[in-house]
């Protein structure tokens, strides 16, 4: 099972997903950001993979390791946007197609996740309590995406997440 969330602003998005997820899971994170206070320990605790963004060879190794672990039953959270924008107002950035190589290699279902208002926690000028929402969308089974290129899979997942965010934003106006 691959959970594809969006807007990896910080480890708190991962915590929101892990808190609401029914099974233990891990995640892939930028190596530089993984060595901050408490984040390092959390990454070690859940055996997160640390990705060196400027090292393609290491990226391929991580993709292969995660694909093997997912095929064996481990669950991972991936953030295909590959970064974040300050105060993004729930806008979805373009997805990096390479993230979806893991799904193709492991034949795992892809579970799109729509995170709503998570950016407000640390990446906006909002003051006061914040309620964030985590929506797990219908899984995309391997049979549905097996003949697609990674960019086509990325586009499919992105569209489903954008539609859910738009639907929820209209419902809560």
Walk through the language-model features, giving the residues of each:
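Membrane-interfacial terminal anchoring regions of lipid-handling membrane enzymes
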Residues: 68, 151-173
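Anionic-ligand binding region
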Residues: 62-66
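A conditional alpha-helix N-cap/helix-loop micro-motif detector
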Residues: 7, 56-60, 92, 150
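A cross-family acyltransferase "interaction/gating" segment
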Residues: 38-40, 74-77, 86-152
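Short glycine-rich anion-binding loops that position phosphate/pyrophosphate groups of nucleotides
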Residues: 8-10, 81-85
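Residue-level preference for the first positions of well-ordered beta-strands
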Residues: 1-2, 75-79
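Catalytic core of membrane glycerolipid acyltransferases/transacylases, capturing the structured
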Residues: 1-55
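Polar-ligand-bearing catalytic/cofactor-coordination segments
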Residues: 50-53, 139-142, 156
């Amino acid at each position: 099972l691959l959970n594809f969330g969006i807007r990896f602003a910080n480890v708190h998005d991962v915590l929101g997903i892990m808190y609401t997820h029914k099974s233990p899971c891990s995640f892939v994170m930028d190596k530089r950001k993984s060595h901050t206070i408490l984040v390092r320990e959390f990454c070690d605790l859940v055996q997160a993979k640390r990705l060196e963004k400027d090292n393609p060879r290491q990226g391929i190794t991580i993709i292969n390791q995660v694909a093997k672990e997912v095929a064996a039953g481990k669950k991972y959270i991936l953030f295909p946007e590959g970064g974040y924008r300050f105060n993004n107002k729930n806008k979805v950035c373009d997805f990096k197609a390479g993230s979806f190589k893991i799904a193709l290699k492991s034949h795992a279902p892809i579970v799109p996740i729509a995170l709503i208002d998570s950016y407000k926690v640390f990446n906006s000028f909002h003051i006061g309590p914040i309620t964030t929402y985590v929506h797990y969308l219908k899984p995309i089974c391997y049979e549905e995406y097996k003949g697609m290129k990674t960019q086509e899979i990325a586009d499919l997942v992105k569209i489903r997440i954008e539609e859910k965010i738009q639907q929820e934003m209209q419902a809560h106006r």
